[in-house]
Structures are given as structure tokens and as C-alpha cells.
Amino acid sequence: MPSADTEFIRVIRIKSANGSEKMLEIPAKLDLERPKRPRTVFTDEQLEKLEESFNTSGYLSGSTRAKLAESLGLSDNQVKVWFQNRRTKQKKIDSRDPIKPETLKPAENYQNVYQNYQNYWTAAAFLSNNVISS
């Protein structure tokens, strides 16, 4: 078993309801007490240009991303992560609203199809199409 002070920063002993004891070892790579990197706060102008670029294309090539990052005074990584997050947000929005205007278009012809369907199943249609044989 690795030593707790070399490879692990914290060892926690947990006692379960049935009385058994378990040891939790948290690796140094998961140092939960280290300070987090401050969150990037985008200006309104940056957000406007990022949204505009996203609406043009949800994906950017490396060179386009680098140019956009430079023009906005951001790092390439900040733009990349913003686009990843924005695509995720868009997928969430799309999944919440499954009825879109383009999915309603086929319904425009529904009335004509329904009338033909009704006409087909009338007694006259049965007789004229020899559907019912005597």
C-alpha cells in the first residue's frame, strides 16, 4: 500500500452504518483545497462577437479561432472553451423545445390527405374500388 504522506494528501476513515470502517485516500492530483482559477468575465462586446461567430458557424477552424481570440483580446483556449460551452447550451435548448417551425410544415397538407382518406373509406369508395366483393 502506498504511503499516505508521499502519494496521497489526505486519508479519511469512514464508518458505515453496519460498523465496518473504510479508508478513503484522496490523490494529490485531486487537491480540493487549491485555489480555483478565476472565472473569465466576458465584456458585452466580446459576447456579441462570440455569439455572432457562433450563429455563423457552431465550429471554428484553428486559424479562425486564433484570429477571433486575438481580435477580442482573449486566449485561444478561452474562445475554444466558450464555443464548447455554447454548443452544449444550444443542445440543451434544442432538446427542451422539440417542436420547431420546420417540423410543423408537413401539417399544412394534412387537411387534403385527411379528406382523401375519408373519401377512400366511404361505402361508395369500397364499392367503386371493388374492395368489398360479394
From Swiss-Prot:
InterPro entries given in the database record: HD, HD_metazoa, Homeobox_CS, Homeobox_TF, Homeodomain-like_sf, HTH_motif
PROSITE patterns: HOMEOBOX_1, HOMEOBOX_2
A GO CC annotation given for this chain: nucleus
Biological processes, Gene Ontology terms: brain development; central nervous system development; neuron differentiation; regulation of transcription by RNA polymerase II
Gene3D superfamilies: Homeodomain-like
Species in which this protein is naturally found: Caenorhabditis elegans
DNA-binding residues: 35-94
Name used for this protein in its record: Homeobox protein ceh-5
Main location as per UniProt: nucleus
SMART domains: HOX (SM00389)
One Gene Ontology molecular-function label: RNA polymerase II cis-regulatory region sequence-specific DNA binding
Compartments reported by the entry: Nucleus
